[in-house]
């Protein structure tokens, strides 16, 4: 009985100090929540973000192929509709973990 009483505080500390499963679970992170999570995960290393490049690609997709480009694309109509795989698609539209966010650290 005395051994049990000595181990009880240790068991309680371990029980209450385990990480919350929600904190480690995959989550939707959008906007400022995504930025805060990146700061948390990356710390002093920082993270990379290239919005201008993304806008250039999106603009090309909106405009579609030019008239002189249509000849080479007759059998490839989805050629210019590329799938995006950025951090917003990965963590906001879908879910991601803190471990996946680490891929965006410098």
UniProtKB/Swiss-Prot annotation:
Main localization (coarse): secreted
InterPro entries: Insulin, Insulin-like, Insulin-like_sf, Insulin_CS, Insulin_family
GO MF entries: hormone activity
Signal peptide positions (record): 1-23
Its biological purpose: Insulin decreases blood glucose concentration. It increases cell permeability to monosaccharides, amino acids and fatty acids. It accelerates glycolysis, the pentose phosphate cycle, and glycogen synthesis in liver.
Oligomer and partners: Heterodimer of a B chain and an A chain linked by two disulfide bonds.
PANTHER family associated with the record: INSULIN, INSULIN/INSULIN GROWTH FACTOR
Protein's recorded name: Insulin-2
Gene this chain is encoded by: ins-b
């Amino acid at each position: 009985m005395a051994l049990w009483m000595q181990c009880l505080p240790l068991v309680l500390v371990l029980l209450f100090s385990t990480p919350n499963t929600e904190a480690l679970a995959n989550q939707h992170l959008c906007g400022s929540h995504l930025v805060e999570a990146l700061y948390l995960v990356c710390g002093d290393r920082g993270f990379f973000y290239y919005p201008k490049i993304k806008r250039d690609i999106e603009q090309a997709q909106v405009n579609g192929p030019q008239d002189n480009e249509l000849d080479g694309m007759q059998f490839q109509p989805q050629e210019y509709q590329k799938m995006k795989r950025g951090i917003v698609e990965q963590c906001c539209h879908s879910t991601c973990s803190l471990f996946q966010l680490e891929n965006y650290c410098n």
